């Protein structure tokens, strides 16, 4: 089981100094990865979780963390693909992979906020087809000597994008989603799946089976998939990843029996850490305490 940690990207604790300190501390304690997420825009009257009201750009945050670390992987869960062109994202993520020495993982989602669709001029229609074409464009840009794509939603004239990502074959792509079709699609076309912040982890085994079934139906090896769980800690009323340190470790071990290959602890959804009115020093102190007590070297 690989263990990661969410960067401070939401709320008052999302400052340059704290991003750097959390990134460095996670690497020193042998965490496997650092993660960010995307929230572009919140409508003035939109009813959303307060942690969404101030969020750093996910790729900029990862680039900042990359400059302060050497080994730890850098993931985003997720970039909402309707809001950006695949060619533009391929260039951004490929460049980050080069500059970080081949450490990037790209999670992709299809978005849910109507305000963000309006703000970006994006369409929320045909999400399945859009996802398939988007992934295909990324891969031809990262893999082929001459890239080209002629789809219903995206077109790429013959050409080249350089430099290519440092990782052979391109940056690993993880798809989000929680409905059966999206889960199967992750197994069919992606390198793995990443769960969302509100996912019911008590049923994750059933979701993993759908991801694996998608891979099998596509003639792919389901054992080669990465199954990444966003571990929101201490969720009020939650059954998983709450309680004592020992209980949280037991929960992580149980997730492994359900087919999860990676868990990252994400504190950005804890209102006592990432809320808009939280004292940032207290938030960082609490986060470092969690990072220390859940040190992956203590997970059997």
What residues fall within each predicted segment?
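N-terminal beta1-alpha1-beta2 module of alpha/beta enzyme domains
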Residues: 1-68, 171, 268, 277-293
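Short, acidic/polar
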Residues: 14-26, 88-93, 175-185, 241-255
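Internal, glycine-rich beta/alpha segment that forms the wall or movable "lid"
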Residues: 42-49, 76, 82-189, 205-223
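Glycine-enriched alpha-helix->loop->beta-strand junction motifs that scaffold or abut catalytic
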Residues: 30, 68-71, 100, 187-193, ...
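Hydrophobic faces of well-ordered beta-strands that scaffold small-molecule active sites
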Residues: 3-7, 34-36, 73-77, 104-108, ...
